[in-house]
Amino acid sequence: MEQNKDPQMISKHSSRLPIWVLSPREEQQARKNLKTETYKKCANFVQAMADCAKANGMKVFPTCDKQRDEMKSCLLFYQTDEKYLDGERDKIVLEKINKLEKLCQKQSSTK
C-alpha cells in the first residue's frame, strides 16, 4: 500500500496517533464487539442456561451448574484468548484505513 505524504491529507486526519494505534474509545469498541461476537458464538450455551434458570427458579444454582459451567467455559474461551480481541482490533484498524483511503481519493479527485 502506497503512503500518501500530502500535508493536507495528514492535517485532515484527526488523530495524532499512528493509524494502527487504537484510541481508548476504539479499544472499548473492540471489546464491546468481542463481547457481542462471543455471545453469538456461545448462543446455544447461553440459551441452555437461560432455559434451565427459567425452569428451576430459585433452585437455579445447584440444578443448573452443568449449563452454567458450559456457558462460562465457552464465553471465557473467546474472551480470554488474545487472538479474538486482536481480530476485533484489526477490524477497527481496517475501517480506519478504508476511511483514510476514501479521504485521500476524495482529496485527489478535487485537485
UniProtKB/Swiss-Prot annotation:
Disulfide bonding pattern of the chain: 42-74, 52-64
The name this protein goes by in its record: COX assembly mitochondrial protein
Record's bilayer topology term: Peripheral membrane protein
Short sequence motif named Cx9C motif 1, residue ranges: 42-52
Subunit structure: Interacts with CMC2.
Misc: Present with 259 molecules/cell in log phase SD medium.
Family that this chain belongs to: Belongs to the CMC family.
Major localization class: mitochondrion
Source organism (scientific name): Saccharomyces cerevisiae (strain ATCC 204508 / S288c) (Baker's yeast)
Pfam families assigned to the protein according to its UniProt record, in alphabetical order: Cmc1
GO biological process, one term: mitochondrial cytochrome c oxidase assembly
Role description: Required for mitochondrial cytochrome c oxidase (COX) assembly and respiration. Binds copper. May be involved in copper trafficking and distribution to mitochondrial COX and SOD1.
